Amino acid sequence: MSPQTETKAGVGFKAGVKEYKLTYYTPEYETKDTDILAAFRVTPQPGVPPEERGAAVAAESSTGTWTTVWTDGLTSLDRYKGRCYHIEPVPGEEEQFIAYVAYPLDLFEEGSVTNMFTSIVGNVFGFKALRALRLEDLRIPVAYVKTFQGPPHGIQVERDKLNKYGRPLLGCTIKPKLGLSAKNYGRAVYECLRGGLDFTKDDENVNSQPFMRWRDRFLFCAEAIYKSQAETGEIKGHYLNATAGTCEEMIKRAVFARELGVPIVMHDYLTGGFTANTTLSHYCRDNGLLLHIHRAMHAVIDRQKNHGMHFRVLAKALRMSGGDHIHSGTVVGKLEGERDITLGFVDLLRDDYIEKDRSRGIYFTQDWVSLPGVIPVASRGIHVWHMPALTEIFGDDSVLQFGGGTLGHPWGNAPGAVANRVALEACVKARNEGRDLAAEGGEIIREACKWSP
């Protein structure tokens, strides 16, 4: 008879429910450089202590379940469990608190944003002991960052490809977003590009509909790009939306774009999914395509102040998954966006090292080491009179993406693009001369109007 091997599972196992805080609340824990750290805004059900709710979040997003199980003894919970290590109140909100949770790195698959989110937010948000839960921020350790390719190219490589320096880039979303034939769509692209824009863009829901199939759109847009390049002597691009119903179809569209010789494609990274986005990002790196990212569906996730995820988390995830541009809000346009908070996640997209700064919503210091940066795209509801503020707020490494602010010009698309370009160059020139864009912006634009055709 073979000898019996004694395990923890066979010694003193006690079935039953016990409080989460007995195992998962560890205020004495000192976080490791390799831990993924999360800041959750917790709104518990009445009568539940913060320590128990914070521990519940840590448990249900890592190794825990609602009861003690025999197989807990077959592993090392101390090694693999998430830990709620700190709790702090939310100023002005009596019923809310911030729970800080540390996750051991071994809980996550390397190079997979999909797995990271499945673990951290995949299940716990439906926990009935919580009235609401919001993931405010994540600290991604260097050890995990280094398992990701990140953006296909990054800011400096994009500027080198386009041969454009010292100013923000200009873009325009073609409108109406749905209903144009491919040929008329291409004409609209051409008019904008020849007028002075650097890019035009497919709207997020332009994929391959009966009125305009993707292949026809790609062909007519490529014609517009080459014609406008020949006329202006500048490199131009159109964000060809490769988003599709399957990853295979998405890659087929990206392959066709590469064969046409265009510089950039586009993906809706939230509706398309992180696995699809990372797949496309790797293809773009390997084949020299820039990748523009649209955040369609983000407000479903990030708009509520007490439930969901803040966009800074989605921005960090995009930098890991891969994209050269991403829409980031405008501060001055028609969509929501507080200046300091917006600039906080803009820095998280562009910079290599970002210090903790709670006034800007940054809960953790983030070191991206060698991961390339992402260009923020300011879009929605902006026009030439916003140009001084946009230039001051976003700086040179940005894309200012117009729509009606170009196409709504009474003389048409090309004059609208000229107006955008003249306004931008006037603001950049004034800034470089030391003028105050915030105080003198209106005067700068009026001066530019005198000489604009």
From Swiss-Prot:
Site (Transition state stabilizer): K334
EC supergroup of this enzyme: lyase
Superkingdom of source: Eukaryota
Active site (record annotation): K175 (proton acceptor), H294 (proton acceptor)
GO biological process, one term: reductive pentose-phosphate cycle
Annotated Gene Ontology cellular component terms: chloroplast
GO MF term (any one): ribulose-bisphosphate carboxylase activity
List of residues that carry N6-carboxylysine: K201
Keyword Ligase: no
Residues reported in the UniProt entry to bind Mg(2+): K201, D203, E204
InterPro entries from the UniProt entry: RuBisCO (IPR033966), RuBisCo_large_chain_AS (IPR020878), RuBisCO_lsu_C (IPR000685), RuBisCO_lsu_C_sf (IPR036376), RuBisCO_lsu_fd_N (IPR017443), RuBisCO_lsu_N_sf (IPR036422), RuBisCO_lsuI (IPR020888)
List of residues binding substrate: N123, T173, K177, R295, H327, S379
Keywords linked to the UniProt accession: Acetylation, Calvin cycle, Carbon dioxide fixation, Chloroplast, Disulfide bond, Lyase, Magnesium, Metal-binding, Methylation, Monooxygenase, Oxidoreductase, Photorespiration, Photosynthesis, Plastid
Localization per Swiss-Prot or TrEMBL: Plastid, Chloroplast
Entry's cofactor comment: Binds 1 Mg(2+) ion per subunit.
Reaction(s) catalysed by this chain's protein: 2 (2R)-3-phosphoglycerate + 2 H(+) = D-ribulose 1,5-bisphosphate + CO2 + H2O; D-ribulose 1,5-bisphosphate + O2 = 2-phosphoglycolate + (2R)-3-phosphoglycerate + 2 H(+)
E.C. code: 4.1.1.39
Family listed: Belongs to the RuBisCO large chain family. Type I subfamily.
Quaternary state and interactors: Heterohexadecamer of 8 large chains and 8 small chains; disulfide-linked. The disulfide link is formed within the large subunit homodimers.
Function: RuBisCO catalyzes two reactions: the carboxylation of D-ribulose 1,5-bisphosphate, the primary event in carbon dioxide fixation, as well as the oxidative fragmentation of the pentose substrate in the photorespiration process. Both reactions occur simultaneously and in competition at the same active site.
Matching PANTHER family: RIBULOSE BISPHOSPHATE CARBOXYLASE (PTHR42704), RIBULOSE BISPHOSPHATE CARBOXYLASE LARGE CHAIN (PTHR42704:SF15)
Protein name: Ribulose bisphosphate carboxylase large chain
